[in-house]
């Protein structure tokens, strides 16, 4: 049985540091150091581990932030990783739900994180399983990294906004269907994107450029991603006007 719990000791947090190399293949230079995990746990952030019979098989870490304008406190979930052999076991969802539960216990209603728009499995999970929307997009957020999963591409990122106590999120987490405003625009990513990134870097870069250009255009017009459709051929981001979405807190 998988156990999710907060990490408290330096030794446990060192395990999370080691998992970064196993999961993403980061160099020592790019690892988030243990001292940041310790600091996050002490200044209002979150550090959770997922354990299978006492062995850490996943983790997540969030840091506190202030949203402007309005000085609204929120959490930025900077990192979540699960070992490859556990990625279809629901561990990522368990970690996110524990983050949500703990945040709501402190009356924090907003969590954000970033994800690669080409990672269509993650997109489906974030938008359709958790209920996050995408109101912002950032070009080359982290620069070029050494991760084997990034294939040398720029780190263009969707910004996921998860309004933890919204009707949308509660409906989706309960297995229901939220209100679906009319689609205004869409962006498709081919389902074979993982093979393309591994075998045809030039084509992968062209796809990324097209996707990023379209994201920047749509978001500049006040649109946000509120749904994600999957077919055998592609994953498709569905945009609606931001003011029409039922994602605000109750």
Walk through the language-model features, giving the residues of each.
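Intrinsically disordered, low-complexity, positively biased terminal segments
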Residues: 9, 106-108, 124-130, 134-250
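A conserved beta-turn-beta hairpin within the catalytic core of GNAT-like acetyltransferases
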Residues: 65-77, 87, 109, 182-187
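Active-site acidic-Proline motif in GNAT/NAT acetyltransferases
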Residues: 83-85, 115
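Conserved acetyl-CoA-binding loop-helix of GNAT-fold acetyltransferases
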Residues: 87-103, 122, 203, 210
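Conserved GNAT acetyl-CoA-binding A-motif
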Residues: 103-116
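Glycine-rich, histidine-containing beta strand-loop boundary motifs that form or position
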Residues: 114-117, 138-140
């Amino acid at each position: 049985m998988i156990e999710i719990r907060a990490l408290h000791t330096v030794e446990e947090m060192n395990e999370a540091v080691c998992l970064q190399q196993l999961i993403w293949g980061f160099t020592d230079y790019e690892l988030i150091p243990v001292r940041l995990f310790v600091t996050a746990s002490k200044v209002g952030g979150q550090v959770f581990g997922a354990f299978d019979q006492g062995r850490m098989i996943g983790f997540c870490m969030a840091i506190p932030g202030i949203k402007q304008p309005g000085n609204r406190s929120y959490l930025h979930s900077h990192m979540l990783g699960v070992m490859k052999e556990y990625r279809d076991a629901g561990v990522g969802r368990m970690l996110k739900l524990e983050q949500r539960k703990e945040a709501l216990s402190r009356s924090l209603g907003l969590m954000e994180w970033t994800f690669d728009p080409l990672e269509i499995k993650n997109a489906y999970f974030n938008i359709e399983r958790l209920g996050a929307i995408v109101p912002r997009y950032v070009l080359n957020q982290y620069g070029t990294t050494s991760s084997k999963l990034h294939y040398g591409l720029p780190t263009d990122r969707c910004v996921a906004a998860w309004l933890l106590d919204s009707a949308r999120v509660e409906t989706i987490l309960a297995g229901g269907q939220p209100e679906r405003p009319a689609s205004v625009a869409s962006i498709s990513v081919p389902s074979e994107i993982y093979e393309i990134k591994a075998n045809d870097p030039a084509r992968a870069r062209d796809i990324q450029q097209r996707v990023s250009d379209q994201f920047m255009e749509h978001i500049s017009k006040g649109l946000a991603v509120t749904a994600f459709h999957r077919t055998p051929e592609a994953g498709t981001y569905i945009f609606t006007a931001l003011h029409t979405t039922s994602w605000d807190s109750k």
